């Protein structure tokens, strides 16, 4: 029996009650008299998350998130799926099962995300059907290939049909989509979107029946702009390990209240709303629901005192109470990047100057813009211009085909050195940004030797964070990974970076489904026109 002030997410009122638990579920809730200082609320649900972005395997993620009140998450494992296919999804499900946290998964709908890049796997409609029938899979994952949906592509529509035939939701991904095209997209069966960046976008999509997720992660932080727009869910999407140490859904709730969202509404956005949409048994304190709840000090600060899952205490004042198992060992995915001459990173041009397209990054946003710049040409090679903050960027196919594409990027601020990563959404090829090709190649070689991860290089010095699980995740705990990641960011700042999250920003330069100008292993890509762009032909 647990007693206290409870928040009823059905009615929105708070009253003293005792909760009777039997067999891991709530048996009865009885109103009582008494004065209680704390508030008992349902455990938090992160309704849209890519665990891989934390660089932690699910069992390590759970140990870090549960003390912050997160009892459940709906994870789209399309990062590891792009590297390892269905085997990668199975690894995530198996490792998640070793924790008390209730992980649910969506079947990755876009593996690969587009046909304009090289990925490590392909999941067809038949593979989607197989995944949707797994017990912990609750939806079809975000349908990023919105042009194919709008065009009625047979393969894409077969995946959507597989989910709808099983009465499962289909998550969306429709940045800046509007008008008739948005109507076609929603009419195909897409029910959610987490890519909104303005109140006007939220309003249009909600009017058409979409449920909107306000995203507040480590790279994309849209909650402040969307707080007054009337969103349905609060989600993290992508969260770094250092940020996870500071908070998860509890921190997002604090920000939501700071930005003007009613506290009870905010709690509903991370409990009953996602529970009802995805058909979960957690998310409310009522008979028949899972006995998953959090004791907090107030509905403003959301300081988590205790966490219960299935009626059992799992965290107390920030301390995880469950002894961690060794997790599930994943087969490593080696980096198949053949050795290459450094000249392959160069961009050739005739004359003394070249006019080029440049990717312009926006700090805290996944959307990029396109700039046009005139750069010097020396010995037939187009040069970076650190005085204008225009650096080189290259993407190297990591799956053995030998593709290398190069371009230019603005906004990183590096004055020396290079940074590189095998975390490069969504195909997770190897991406590198730098001042000169020699150091860029050195960064690539270090990652090849490490088996994947993140690296920053300057002269003879470097910092590396190894990510041996598919080149995406560590099998260490959050403290170890956060410390290594913090060292990398500090070193990168010393190289001149002015971004709040340079590695996260770099990892999205190759995401060919978020506007506007991106780069994959086959070249520059115009997301809105959904086509490869020539670097120098305007």
Swiss-Prot record:
InterPro entries: Adenine_deam (IPR006679), Adenine_deam_C (IPR026912), Amidohydro-rel (IPR006680), Metal-dep_hydrolase_composite (IPR011059), Metal_Hydrolase (IPR032466). GO terms for molecular function: adenine deaminase activity. The keyword Repeat does not apply. Disulfide bonds: none annotated. The keyword Transport does not apply. GO terms for biological process: adenine catabolic process. Keywords: Hydrolase, Manganese. Its cofactor is Mn(2+). It catalyses: adenine + H2O + H(+) = hypoxanthine + NH4(+). Its EC number is 3.5.4.2. It is an enzyme of class 3 (hydrolase). NCBIfam families: ade. Belongs to the metallo-dependent hydrolases superfamily. Adenine deaminase family. This is Adenine deaminase. It comes from Methanothermobacter thermautotrophicus (strain ATCC 29096 / DSM 1053 / JCM 10044 / NBRC 100330 / Delta H) (Methanobacterium thermoautotrophicum).
